[in-house]
Regions:
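Terminal, non-catalytic domain-edge segments
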Residues: 1-6, 130-234
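Internal amphipathic alpha-helical repeat/solenoid segments
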Residues: 3-72
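Small-side-chain structural scaffolding
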Residues: 7, 11, 31-34, 53, ...
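Alpha-helical scaffold segments in carbohydrate-active enzymes
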Residues: 13, 39, 59, 78, ...
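Solvent-exposed loop and edge beta-strand segments that line ligand/cofactor-binding
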Residues: 14-30, 62-75, 111-124, 157-177, ...
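Specific register positions within alpha-helical solenoid repeats of the TPR/Sel1-like families, i.e.
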Residues: 35-38, 42, 81-84, 88, ...
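Extended ligand-binding groove/face enriched in aromatic
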Residues: 51-146
Length: 234
C-alpha cells in the first residue's frame, strides 16, 4: 500500500470519528483534528476540508467550559497555541487577540508561582509555550498586550528557577527574556516540531482503532508526519 493510500485511509477514519471525540484538547482531542484538517486543506486546496475544519473548530469553542483545564495537552493553552499556529501559518484567517482574549484571561488566573508540575503536557512548560507564542505573534506597539508585565515577570522567574526541567529545543527562557526586554522575535512562527518529534519513524497499524485518534502517539500524529513528508512543509 502506497503512502498516499495509507494517508487516505487514515484521513477517512479521522473524518468519521473526530466529531464524536469527547476531549476537546489539542494533543488528545478535537483541536488536534482542527489543526490537522486546516493544514491538510491548505496542502491540497480543497474547500471541503476547510469546511470540515471550520465545523470541528466551532464544536471545540462551543464546548469550552468554566472548568476547562488550562494545560497544553487537554486544555486552553494547547487550544490557543493551535489557533496561533493556524493563523500565523496562513491556514485560516482571523484576529488572534479577539479569538483568544477569554483564553488569555483564564490562563492568567492561574498563579504560576504555585505550579509544581513542570511538564509540557500538564504543567509550566506548556503554559510557557502558549504565552510566548502569543506574545511573538505580531508587533502590538501601541496596543494592549495579552498578558500584563507582572504576569510575565512571575512566569519568567518561575521558568528560570526550573530551567533545567524545560526542553532546550524550545528556547523558552531566552524567548521570554527577549519579550521582557521588548525585543520579541516576530519572525518566529509556531511549528509542528514544537509539539511533536518529526524525526521519529512512522508505523501505521493495520487496525487503526488500536491507536488513539489524537496527536499524542496517535493517528493524527502519523497523518501529520505522512503529509508533512510528502509536502516537506511542516
Amino acid at each position: 500500500m502506497s503512502h498516499k493510500e495509507i494517508s487516505d485511509r487514515i484521513i477517512k477514519y479521522l473524518m468519521i470519528n473526530y466529531p464524536f471525540v469527547a476531549d476537546i484538547g489539542l494533543m488528545n482531542g478535537r483541536m488536534g483534528g482542527v489543526l490537522f484538517f486546516y493544514y491538510y486543506a491548505k496542502c491540497i486546496g480543497e474547500d471541503y476540508f476547510f469546511d470540515y475544519a471550520d465545523m470541528l473548530f466551532e464544536s471545540v469553542f462551543t464546548s469550552l467550559r468554566q472548568d476547562t483545564p488550562i494545560d497544553f495537552a487537554n486544555g486552553l493553552c494547547g487550544i490557543g497555541w493551535a489557533v496561533e499556529y493556524i493563523l500565523q501559518n496562513g491556514l485560516s484567517e482571523g484576529e488572534p487577540d479577539e479569538v483568544l482574549e477569554d483564553i488569555d484571561k483564564k490562563v492568567m488566573e492561574r498563579d504560576v508561582r504555585r505550579i509544581s508540575d513542570m511538564s509540557f503536557d500538564t504543567g509550566l512548560e506548556g503554559i510557557l509555550l502558549y504565552v510566548i507564542t502569543r506574545l511573538e505573534s505580531f508587533d502590538r506597539a501601541g496596543l494592549p498586550k495579552p498578558f500584563n508585565r507582572s504576569y510575565i515577570e512571575e512566569l519568567y522567574a518561575k521558568a528560570y528557577e526550573n530551567k533545567d526541567s524545560l526542553s532546550p529545543h524550545l528556547q523558552l527562557i531566552k524567548r521570554l527574556a527577549d519579550i521582557q526586554a521588548e525585543r520579541p522575535d516576530f519572525a518566529r512562527k509556531p511549528n509542528i516540531s514544537d509539539i511533536i518529534s518529526l524525526s521519529e519513524s512512522v508505523t501505521v497499524p493495520e487496525n487503526l482503532r488500536s491507536l488513539p485518534i489524537g496527536i499524542k502517539n496517535g493517528l493524527t500524529e502519523i497523518a501529520l508526519k505522512l503529509i508533512g513528508k510528502a509536502q516537506n512543509s511542516l
